[in-house]
Amino acid sequence: MVGLKPSEVPPTTAVKFLGAGTAACFADLLTFPLDTAKVRLQIQGENQATQAARRIQYRGVLGTILTMVRTEGPRSPYNGLVAGLQRQMSFASIRIGLYDSVKQFYTPKGSDHSSITTRILAGCTTGAMAVSCAQPTDVVKVRFQASIHLGAGSNRKYSGTMDAYRTIAREEGVRGLWKGTLPNITRNAIVNCAEMVTYDIIKEKLLDYHLLTDNFPCHLISAFGAGFCATVVASPVDVVKTRYMNSPPGQYCSPLDCMLKMVTQEGPTAFYKGFTPSFLRLGTWNVVMFVTYEQLKRALMKVQMLRESPF
């Protein structure tokens, strides 16, 4: 590594793992209200809402956030943030941080180029691994985001994040913390493939054709394209996942039952409820995360090189 710039030194797996989790947490801090708005729009129309909650109608991303602030207070768009950050540190670290390592594992020996099939396999693998580890944090995050508290006198089911884990495990069993794992694995396999493979390919082509250098504009364009593709392919699964994870025991027999009830009761357009906030969320999140991730990798490699330098 002597004589090389930090940007020229291949980052280690540990650097990618730490950088991905940190960058994802930073992206979540900036975009969490958009995610909460998406969840509220996705569950709107369900029959489980209280009478007071049914009177609230959410219209659009900004309208949803403003309605939440007006009826529930300024902190409401950040309900579930702690669980969200816990999720990203375990979830993004695996699905993004380990993507290159798994891609290299699937690449045939002697080949210096990864095929699209190899990249898709890597995306599916790290996405499934991440869900297996982070599912309880996702369940708690969605429960907080979906809960409506109209004033100081309203009942709060959970007093805090740790209480939510305990309450769900006590009332629904440990399996309650893993509710919706199958649709979530499906969703994140799709999202991870769309995000990572699209980002990988766009960035590779921009560099191969010398359209851009490996810097901010290249990362920005690649991340935006990744966010758009991920939203288009993942929205239907995302809506089913949100509805199923937020549902009380007995409302849906399975994710498939949830999907069928959505079609019969609300029509096929229900699968794209919250599409705009989903795109704003994923698009913005991808831009912030990937740009931060690329810079963090370089910064961490620079620190590592300084520590290893004899002078």
UniProtKB/Swiss-Prot annotation:
Q: How does it sit in the membrane?
A: Multi-pass membrane protein
Give the GO biological process terms.
adaptive thermogenesis; mitochondrial transmembrane transport; response to cold
GO CC field: mitochondrial inner membrane
- The segments carrying the Solcar repeats are 11-105, 114-205, 214-299
Q: Which residues lie on this side of the membrane: Mitochondrial intermembrane?
A: 1-10, 100-119, 200-216, 294-311
Assigned protein family: Belongs to the mitochondrial carrier (TC 2.A.29) family.
Assembly and interactions?
Answer: Interacts with HAX1; the interaction is direct and calcium-dependent.
- Name under which the protein is recorded: Putative mitochondrial transporter UCP3
